[in-house]
Amino acid sequence: MLIPLMLSSLVGLSSAPPIRLATCEVSTPNTFQNDNGPTTVGEYTLHVRFSDATSEPISRVLFTLNDGSQVSDVGTFSPGVTINHVLGLSSTDATSCTATIVRFANGAIWNGN
């Protein structure tokens, strides 16, 4: 029983990111001019596509955008499965992001900060 616990704790200490981040794109609303004035369509969103690169399920990934804002993706992310999510954002000037904290289902945490 000690070996699985010890191994899972070491996953949280690894310096390599435990996810493979394939896409991290910020989308902004578009404003169009029409006869009635400007119309805004859409909203600020973060499109992330990633997969768990470990053998342990992940329960939460914190993404930090290049303007310092953060957004979490919470769920059960199984090893090797591609996750493709669009997450809502507040107004932002960000153009990119990185995964900075990953929480595993067993409670271990990887911190890339």
What are these model-predicted stretches?
Residues 17, 70, 74, 78-79, ...:
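Terminal connector regions
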Residues 1-12:
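Hydrophobic alpha-helical targeting segments used for export or membrane insertion
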Residues 17-62:
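Short, surface-exposed binding/anchoring microloops in extracellular/periplasmic proteins
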